[in-house]
């Protein structure tokens, strides 16, 4: 995750702003500079290489002292920064909005995936600039639309029906902020269209998840798509979701947390997010993740969760 101010800076033109991407040498200069505390939140002028990000965001970049940041000297950083600027320059950002826009925290991996989709000649985003910009505006929180299959971050499609598409995420192969844990495996499920879904499509998805992904929990971060994650990573997701929800509420960026379809979401996660929305503390909410839930009646007649061991998928072992 990183603020948009880590990728670009605003230049006032008439009554709106044009956004310009940073170059890696300006960032490198800022990372070595001694800056007064009162100037930590101001864009840094490198004199030689142009404007650089505010020094308060130093930890967002990979250095000898911080290996958890972005690999800003890679070509992928430039591609992501340019893509963000193209999207922001396609809309009007006024003086009253610019600080709020640049302080927004976005998913770096999501944006790298959109670059990969843009460069894939077989992908619809390669052929449609309009759809690409729409996908980026959704990714950076500048659009209220949800991420659907056409505008999704992408990955490897492992399941699809008339209503849903399931993607295996490819973060292990990333350049900008790769996941280093070689055991990482995670999926995302997007809606093909933002419209009511038939019971038969939900039943097909639930059957696929129970047969093939029984070692994973289906959760949501509240943004209109599902995530399929290892049970061992659920607590980590809970911490992140709770922190984001509270930060958004504190900063006034209140967006409706979409609980999604209770028939698909893992029962304990649904309880956790419902409790969070009611205003309970993190400790109270997280207890629900580890509590034995009363088994609800199966909403789909004839769809059993009972399988013989040799019939059950071993994905995730």
Swiss-Prot record:
Q: Which residues bind ATP?
A: 107-109, 188, 221-223, 227
Q: Where in the cell is it found?
A: Host cytoplasm
Swiss-Prot/TrEMBL cofactor(s): Mg(2+)
Q: What UniProt keywords apply to this chain's record, in alphabetical order?
A: ATP-binding, Host cytoplasm, Hydrolase, Magnesium, Metal-binding, Nucleotide-binding, RNA-binding
- GO cellular component assignments: host cell cytoplasm
Q: Which Pfam families match?
A: Rota_NS35_C, Rota_NS35_N
Keyword Nucleotide-binding in the entry? The reply is: yes
RNA-binding: annotated segments: 205-241
* Broad class of enzyme this protein falls into: hydrolase
Catalytic site:
225
UniProt GO MF annotations:
ATP binding; metal ion binding; nucleoside diphosphate kinase activity; ribonucleoside triphosphate phosphatase activity; RNA binding
Q: What is its EC number?
A: 3.6.4.-
Keyword Zinc listed: no
**Which sequence ranges form a coiled-coil region, renumbered to this chain?**
none
Question: InterPro entries under this entry?
Answer: Rota_NS35_C, Rota_NS35_N, Rotavirus_NSP2, Rotavirus_NSP2_C, Rotavirus_NSP2_N
- Tell me which Gene Ontology terms the entry assigns under biological process: viral genome replication
User: What superkingdom heads the lineage?
Assistant: Viruses
The record's similarity note reads: Belongs to the rotavirus NSP2 family.
Quaternary arrangement and interactors, per the entry?
Homooctamer. Interacts with VP1; this interaction is weak. Interacts with NSP5; this interaction leads to up-regulation of NSP5 phosphorylation and formation of viral factories. Interacts with host DCP1A, DCP1B, DDX6, EDC4 and EIF2S1/eIF2-alpha; these interactions are probably part of the sequestration of some host SGs and PBs proteins in viral factories.
Job description of the protein: Participates in replication and packaging of the viral genome. Plays a crucial role, together with NSP5, in the formation of virus factories (viroplasms), which are large inclusions in the host cytoplasm where replication intermediates are assembled and viral RNA replication takes place. Displays ssRNA binding, NTPase, RNA triphosphatase (RTPase) and ATP-independent helix-unwinding activities. The unwinding activity may prepare and organize plus-strand RNAs for packaging and replication by removing interfering secondary structures.
| Protein name as annotated | Non-structural protein 2
Q: Per the UniProt entry, what species is this protein from, by scientific name?
A: Rotavirus A (strain RVA/Human/United States/P/1974/G3P1A[8]) (RV-A)
